[in-house]
Amino acid sequence: MKAAIVFLCLGVSALAQQKQRFGQPPEQNRLASACGPQDQDYKVRLDRSQHGPVPPQAGKALVYFIHDDGTGVGGAGLGYPTTKYAVDGSWVGANHGESWFAVAVTPGEHHVCTELQSSLLAERVELAHLTVAAGKSYYFRTQLVTSRSVELLELEKIDSDEAGYLFSEYPMATATAKR
């Protein structure tokens, strides 16, 4: 019995040290090519008058981030966490509840990160990469899927038809960085 307790204590200690792999501090282990600084949070304002895509700027592509909170009520639930998004290591905006926003990017390959902004839920991160062409639009949907013991943040590419439907139902989000 004493041996089991010793092994349990050693195992917990080893797991606690895994955040500092390969001699790097934990912050440098964060997926720097996609996610932004961990301490950046946003306040989100919803604009219910904006419904729909906008044409891309000349020489740029647009990447849309649409969050579907799964409630089917077309708005932000009071307790629903904010979802923030990064492209190539810089946060570009956030959604709260069912909402969307777009960001202009240069043509080429990009790395996308989405993360829940919450102190109540454990860190939830999803990653993707995409290659974009000037004049084109690309769409990602996030959903927080919960069950009895599991919470998953899902990030998926969707087509323009699905995005068009979601634009018609959801307000546009404008995120302001918290100081």
Task: Describe each model-derived feature in a short phrase.
Residues 17-179:
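Short loop/turn and low-complexity linker motifs enriched in small/turn-promoting residues
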Residues 7-16:
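Hydrophobic h-region of N-terminal signal peptides that target proteins for export
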Residues 1-7:
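Sec-dependent signal peptide recognition
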